[in-house]
Amino acid sequence: MIIGNGGIAKSFESSKLDHKLLCIIAAGHSDSTVNDAHSFRREVNMIKRVHKNHTNSKTIYFSTTSKYLSATQTAYIKHKISMETLIASCSTRYTIINLPNVICSLNKNNQLIPWLYHSLQSGKQIDINPEARRYIVSSDEIPLCVEKIANKDYKQVALMPQTALKMYELIEIMEKITSKKFNVNYSNFTEYYQKIFEPKQYDFVYEVNGSRKNIERILTKLIRTYE
């Protein structure tokens, strides 16, 4: 069973994954800027309801690698950690899959890639630390990760690229694809997302290709389809 209708949930539509014995919760918050107690409570209630109605299924929940990579514990990160605790208290049959920045769609929201794309299209000035790093994966990798770990007893899994891209590289990639220039102010302001990924913090790491060439390929396909 798949719960949700967003980008992550839709990534399972073309997947061959047999999820009849799984309860894949893909309906949580993906906007790391959110700080809404009401919507946080709604997710708590949803998870409790799911566990009550699907006691025989293994739960797959998507959290964030930012809980270890971020130097600042935002409301969003604290909420994700509390959701992990809730799931662990409801069942012993679960896996938390921690995600970095996910390329799902270009629909307007506060996620990194859509924010960059629409800032580029509008000419809005953005402030960027060029040396800041971002770990980026495609949503197409998520069903493959779930298939890999579905029958394992891992509690904490990370879906991570082998390398991180610097922000100036992302800027260059999107400018190349669109033949447009960002209105960007490069500055060395303090970045809250500077820590290096540590595999030992997880039971299993599902590694994907995060090279500049591969991210350019994924973004080219996404942008061409959107436009």
Language-model segment annotations:
Residues 40-49, 64-104, 108:
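Catalytic helix-loop patch of NAD(P)-dependent Rossmann-fold dehydrogenases
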Residues 14-56, 64-72:
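NAD(P)H-binding glycine-rich loop region in Rossmannoid oxidoreductase-like domains
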Residues 25, 58-63, 95-98, 158-159:
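Structural signature of the Rossmann-like NAD(P)-dependent dehydrogenase/reductase core
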Residues 89-96, 100-134, 139-141:
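NAD(P)-dependent short-chain dehydrogenase/reductase
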Residues 145, 151-199, 216-227:
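Mid/C-terminal beta-alpha module of Rossmann-like enzyme folds, strongest
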Residues 1-5, 125-127, 157-160:
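Short hydrophobic beta-strand segments
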Residues 1-17:
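N-terminal Rossmann NAD(P)H-binding glycine-rich loop of SDR-like oxidoreductase domains
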Residues 134-137, 162-165, 210:
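Residue-level signal for the nucleotide or nucleotide-sugar donor/cofactor binding architecture
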